[in-house]
Amino acid sequence: MDGQSEHVGGPSVREELIAIRERWHCMNHPFYDRLSEGELELRHLAYFLVQHSLLVRQIFRSIGVTYAKSPDDIAHFIVENLAEEAGLLGIDGGEAHDHRDLIFRFTRHSGWTDDDVRNAELLPTWYARAAYYWWITDAEPPIVRIAVQATQESQLVGENGARAVPALIEHYGFSENSPEIGFFTEHATADVKHGDILLDLVEKHATTPELRARALRLAEQTCKLRWVSFNELYRVTHLGEEVGQAPE
């Protein structure tokens, strides 16, 4: 099989993962529609970054377990990705940025104190996403975790490149070089590379029909959960609803 995923006719596993991502792509969510219209408050976009930062903290801790279980090429990607996230390595030789610092630039501009960000809690569906990553890491082969991640990181390209950055420039007074929106501009391009590498790894290591089917199933479940987490984010921010409250 020369290390490629086994399938007879039909789409490749790469093509199927891309189709799953596009079907559930959160750049099509009403949250980003309101942003593109200039109707979303900046503090609500900042709250997305707060939730994202808390989630990523758990994702990267759990992926350390995946690193320990992975073949060398997957392990190398994980180390490089972690180094870029922490600002120890620039993307494609560019300037290195700690992504937490990029987030703080925008949250400070939007009225959040650093303590507010650090002391925030994950919304219930975002907490469920974190727990789901830990479960996949514990229960599934490393390549299933990589397939899941392939459908998640690459969504940031569309969300930021097609929706967030143009909206922030058109409606909110920023320029493409405004340091406050550095998180959005960097992720409009950085995750193209990451997504391609992840898809290549899945093509190489999802070598049986059973492994391929499992990777696709859990990738779609993760995409659905991401969409649902944006539903909750949208409801508690733009719609101002109280969700997840204990009954009286």
PLM region descriptions:
Residues D33-E41, I59-A83, A164-E176, T207:
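Helix-loop segments that flank and shape redox-cofactor active sites
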Residues Y67, P71, G111-V117, P209-L216:
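Structural helix-adjacent loops and short alpha-helical linkers that scaffold large soluble proteins
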Residues T107, E186-A190, E203-V228, E242-E248:
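C-terminal, helix-dominated tail/subdomain
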